[in-house]
Amino acid sequence: FAGIIWGNSSYALVSSSWYDTRNTKTFVLNPSSGVARLIVDRNSQDIYSNPGSVFRDKNEFGMFTMYINKDKSYWVGPGFTKDGEFPFIEELDLKTLKKKRLYTAKESELQERIVQIVDINKGDILISLQSATQFPNYYAKNIKSGKQQEITSIVNPFQSLAAVQKEVLNYKRNDGVDLSGTL
C-alpha cells in the first residue's frame, strides 16, 4: 500500500509499490462497491513510462481531492522521451479508462514546467519557463489557443556568474603524484 487519493463516492485512486521489484501499481477504486481496476503497472525507476500525477482541487470541505469532471480525471506528467522532456496533460476517462492527450509542451530552447491547472474546461494552465541563462518566470497559458501571457519578469539575480567557466587544474603534489581538479 502506498496511498489513496480520494475523489468522490464513485472514484478514488489506490496505489501500491514494492521496493524489491521497483513495481508500482495504481487502481481506480469505486469506494461504494469496492471494485478496483488497474490503470498503472510500471517500474518506478522507468522515467519514460511515468504517467504523472492526478490533478487535485479543493472540495467543499477544503480538502484536496482528485478533480473529477463528468467521470474524467486529469494528469500532469513530466513527459520524458528519448528526445527530451516534454511535460503533458492527459485526460483519463474513469469509466472506460481511455486516455486522451490534451497538451504536450513543444520543443524549445526554454524548459517548460507545468505548475498548475487553473481551469481545465477553458484550457487555462500556469507554466514556468527557464533556460541555463534565463531565470524561471511564470506564464498563463491556454492549451486550446496556444496563447501565453507573462506573469512574472524576474531578471536572473546571478547574472554576474554568467561568464564563469569550468577549468581543469593539473598540478603535481610535493611527493610527485600528478593530481587534477575541476574548478
Q: Where are the regions that the model predicts?
A:
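Signature of short aromatic-glycine-proline-rich micro-motifs recurring in repeat-based ectodomains
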Residues: 52-72, 115-117
